[in-house]
């Protein structure tokens, strides 16, 4: 059965273009279009699509307000289109907090050297998020990142796509044994689709005196990572910044890999930022950072693979395991997309599998 898609944008040209691209894929059926947020809600209720694509800047009602309403009334995976600017990044992160599952730059065809490949990416994203965990996106929206810097985090200060919606049963408790305590020299966390909210959920549980350095690898465009790091820094008690070449790892500091580049660490505790290798699908790539950590710290790394499509992180996890380090994976019930964690689990590389709400607490227990 074809995936039913609702396309919402105030630009007639863009609605037609997105509809043409999606309709060219035999697995996708465009069942309706809308020109603003109000129409998005009306059409979502009437047509019950499997996926909605939506712009964030529209008349009458903006995309973020529409997403919040849709998540409350008929939870549906939403793919947001955004601009590759700092402001576009901020708005996109707000949309993810409101319940959107993924995003693409609005000029996705123009910025690619291979338009055919990026058109295929749009279809792949739609097909993938159509299979996303609806229970994990069905939450009322949460406030945007306006809290004071490093204030204690409350359970309500995190985004929507990681939580269980009204009327749904809670995710099952983690079945893995208590985490092994060890003097870890590094905590490395890798993620993709659903990651911005998942990282927010985990990191806001860490105390300001968290005893280990952290590196974060989130598949994200170059224009977005600085805004995302700033957002996390406002919400978390630990410090968070976008990594720069030469940064020094230190306890209580999380360094986010910059988009479009690769991040590596060395045994002296120094971060190296390298140009993105065109041969790699992801920039930043979880495998690259995990692999460098395995070489630098042997058995002193605690790695966590969170929600995301694909299998990035699996080979890096294999190297970490060969050196004696610990690898955790997020459980299927709490993932938006159970791809990257599943790859680690199926390869028998996960020492523990935890629900998203348990990971932060277990990190504290393991590293104290």
UniProtKB/Swiss-Prot annotation:
The keyword Cytoplasm applies. Residues 4-121 form the Response regulatory domain. InterPro entries: CheB-like, CheB_C, CheY-like_superfamily, Sig_transdc_resp-reg_Me-estase, Sig_transdc_resp-reg_receiver. The modification 4-aspartylphosphate is found at residue 55. CDD domains: CheB_Rec (cd16432), REC_CheB-like (cd17541). GO terms for molecular function: phosphorelay response regulator activity; protein-glutamate methylesterase activity; protein-glutamine glutaminase activity. Residues 144-176 have a biased composition (Low complexity). Keywords: Chemotaxis, Cytoplasm, Hydrolase, Phosphoprotein. Pfam families: CheB_methylest, Response_reg. Residues 172-368 form the CheB-type methylesterase domain. Residues 138-176 are annotated as: Disordered. The active site is at residues 192, 219, 312. NCBIfam families: PRK00742.1 (NF001965). Contains a C-terminal catalytic domain, and an N-terminal region which modulates catalytic activity. This is Protein-glutamate methylesterase/protein-glutamine glutaminase 1. The gene is cheB1.
